[in-house]
Amino acid sequence: FDGDGDLDVLVQGQVDLTPFVLLYIENQSMDLYGTADSLKYRLVNPCWGHVREYISQTGWTEFVCDTGRAANQRLRHGGTTLTSLDLNNDGIVDLLTGDSYNPYLRSLVNVMDNVDAEIDLTLSDTTFPVYNQPAILPNIPAAYIEDVDGDGINDMLVAPNQLTDGATSFFDTSITKEVDWYYRNTGSNLNPNFELESAGFFSGEMIDVGARSFPAMVDLNGDQLLDLVLGNEGYTIY
């Protein structure tokens, strides 16, 4: 994040029952040893972006950070995915987030700098990418930035990070079908424009009947050839 060559960490955390905040934890390897091969971390910004998240449909809100957290207070993760990238070609890291309570990706646009960040929610989308087909995936969706088609420009893959969302039946795996979305970047790495190419990037080339699927081979029609029967846990049989 600070451009010195070692890997820093941005993580969501919670202190006791307070709303979830973003914590910037800086790797001190280059500062202390002159190399990027060590993991020596220090909490630098306990409220990165000056935003917090309630576990409800209200999502992210802006706030003034209280930096007086006691060092021994326990941090808890909030079931949120974070993907860092520059969304608007200003050279500053922005975020894409996914949550356990919402099937959409959200963008958080940073208007300050990478370390002392300031998220402007008026520039942020609650259904990303709002200019194309928004990603709608249950169970903590996450964005993965990779050059999928080999053109030197990073594309976006979106997939869930949990099998069930708790609201539906644990055994209803129908919502796990076609949950690997591929967005091609028709813009650039610094100013991306993601357009949906496929809602089944991997599963479109497979027999997709959802999670916990099991095959059975049996001759169903007596032609002495094995047929394929597929079922998944508690949903249906094919």
Predicted segments, located by residue:
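Beta-propeller-forming repeat regions
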Residues: 1-238
